[in-house]
């Protein structure tokens, strides 16, 4: 566990039963956590970061992740969390049950325009599994690989942790 992650977990414990919130910022000195005050009218169910806290974090370096917690909740982003994450275009780190779950920002699964290697079939199910907390590696693939008799999805299943049952 990194020092940043330790600071995040300590902040989350201090905030219970309210949701904690803050930012992971990359500074010239390295990565650090900037805790924020949850100004939500219902802090035990939602979080809201004051614009001043957002600006304070941006002034310290590049914001690389927004962090919040689900005390007593589930270890994945809610529907509202996902909408806000997409608007923020940031990775979101979620603290739940003493663990940090890291969610990279992925676009909505429906309505995507097909682009090989960017928003293709593998990217779609890789993103869907990611939203469920399962990370799958990306792999290099040339366009039209399926026309040469290859099946990169099945060939790479073992690498992603899947196995035949």
Segments the model singles out, each with a brief description of its role:
Residues 116-132:
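Active-site nucleophilic cysteine motif
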Residues 142-165:
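...with weaker cross-activation on analogous glycine-rich loops/strands in unrelated enzymes
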Residues 105-109:
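Short, surface-exposed amphipathic charged segments that create phosphate/polyanion-binding patches used
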Residues 1-65, 71-104:
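Conserved beta-strand-loop surface patch within small alpha/beta domains used
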Residues 64, 136-140:
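Glycine-rich phosphate/pyrophosphate-binding loops
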Residues 127-133, 141-146:
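Histidine/lysine/aspartate-rich catalytic loop segments that bind and position anionic ligands
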Residues 110-115:
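Second-shell loop/turn segments in exported
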Residues 31-32, 137, 163-164:
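Short secondary-structure junctions
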């Amino acid at each position: 566990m990194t020092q940043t992650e330790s600071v995040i977990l300590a902040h989350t414990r201090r905030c219970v039963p309210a949701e904690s919130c803050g930012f992971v910022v990359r500074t010239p000195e390295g990565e650090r956590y900037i805790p924020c005050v949850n100004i939500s009218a219902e802090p035990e169910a939602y979080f809201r970061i004051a614009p001043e806290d957002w600006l304070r974090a941006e002034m310290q370096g590049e914001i690389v992740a927004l962090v919040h917690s689900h005390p007593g909740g589930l270890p994945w982003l809610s529907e509202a969390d996902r909408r806000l994450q997409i608007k923020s275009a940031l990775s979101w780190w979620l603290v739940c049950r003493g663990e940090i779950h890291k969610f990279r920002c992925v676009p909505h699964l429906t309505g995507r325009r097909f682009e090989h290697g960017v928003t293709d079939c593998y990217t779609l199910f890789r993103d869907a599994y990611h939203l469920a907390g399962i990370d799958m590696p990306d792999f290099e693939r040339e366009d039209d690989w399926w026309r040469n008799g290859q099946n990169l999805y099945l060939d790479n299943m073992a690498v992603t942790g899947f196995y035949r049952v």
